[in-house]
Amino acid sequence: MKVLSLFSGCGGMDLGLEGGFLAHRSSINSDLYASYISDHDENYVYLKKTGFETVFANDILPFAKLAWCNFFKNRVNQPENIFHLESIVDVVNNIENKQFSFPNDIDVVTGGFPCQDFSFAGKRKGFDSHKDHNGIIYNEPTEATRGQLYLWLKKVVEITKPKVFIAENVKGLVTLGDVKDIIQKDFRNIDDGYVVLDAQVLNAKNYGVAQNRERVIFIGISKRYANKKILDELISLQEKSEVYPYPPYTHGTDPELKPYATLNQILAHLPEPELASTDKSQQSYSKAKLFKKTQGNIEVNMNGQAPTIRAEHHGNIEFRRLSKENGGTNLSELHLPQRRLTVRECALIQSFPPDYEFVFNYGKANSVSASAAYKIIGNAVPPLLGFAIGRHLSQIWDKLFKT
């Protein structure tokens, strides 16, 4: 099944939908995922592929493309021909001007349209953002400014007519007036006709991610391709339907679920940065000083989940540990130097596999720095959240679209 990915970044959603990557054992509910896992080593299992394949990706960040292609080169031929380094506005304009065309027979369109203008951490300008798709600031908001780029995702859906589309954004969108309702209405008005269920806020920790990360997910299902009887049942029963597209929890406090993954579990096997002889991503971490009472200047709770990993500069990367003088509470690590989370630690917290290189060729052409890596990791959809969606969709696919 072919996936067209928009606002792809370093490919968290792409990788998740596809499967075929390593995940920490504490992050996987082996009872629910039994047919999708195979042993790898004492820390990791291998998640089998779901049947989805990314055939088009795009982003405006050069280092996002570098990281994406560097990882996906082991999964596809010529990944640089799949990933298009241009904005969604330029992509659509080039399609309409017949400069190039999308791949045929797209099954799924997915996109995490820019969230800065809807997030609690940002300025919450929403639809009134004056920054455009290439970062240029205008006097008045337009359809090409960040807060309205979901309309260009809508255009891509109208062009490609997939069976399913998935749109993702921050939880803050839900509390920003009637923004969620407006977006849902616009998605429901797509030319070819889609059933768009009420958007759901999913917390990544309920899917094995050792992080408290809430995201609002919109899912649309094509009326053209779906079985009418099954679709009518879905509309009527909503979450009680056997083809409800939002994935069930795998982790939580319910005794039938696996307990939430903790930072101690997913980070315990890592050496300290100075001892990480080959992994540049574990060697690299922000040296920014502690600034009390500002965002990101707290110590993570190793016995729980990390706060949301953000796509911001080094001074907002949480501390792996604080010193005793600065209020450090991680008793087993107080003898070690105070430091912030490494790039690798942030990546594992986001559930990226340990073989995904984020810092490479430093100081050379086509390099990705630690600063760039922090940014693309913080912008990403956690792969395990994407996998939960992809696995569940693959399981209900035939029933949804059988004729």
Swiss-Prot record:
One of its GO terms (molecular function) is DNA (cytosine-5-)-methyltransferase activity. Its EC number is 2.1.1.37. It comes from the Bacteria. The active site is at residue 115. Residues 1-400 form the SAM-dependent MTase C5-type domain. Keywords: DNA-binding, Methyltransferase, Restriction system, S-adenosyl-L-methionine, Transferase. It catalyses: a 2'-deoxycytidine in DNA + S-adenosyl-L-methionine = a 5-methyl-2'-deoxycytidine in DNA + S-adenosyl-L-homocysteine + H(+). InterPro entries: C5-Methyltransferase, C5_DNA_meth_AS, C5_MeTfrase, C5_meth_CS, SAM-dependent_MTases_sf. Pfam families: DNA_methylase. One of its GO terms (biological process) is DNA restriction-modification system. Belongs to the class I-like SAM-binding methyltransferase superfamily. C5-methyltransferase family. This is Type II methyltransferase M.BepI. It comes from Brevibacterium epidermidis.
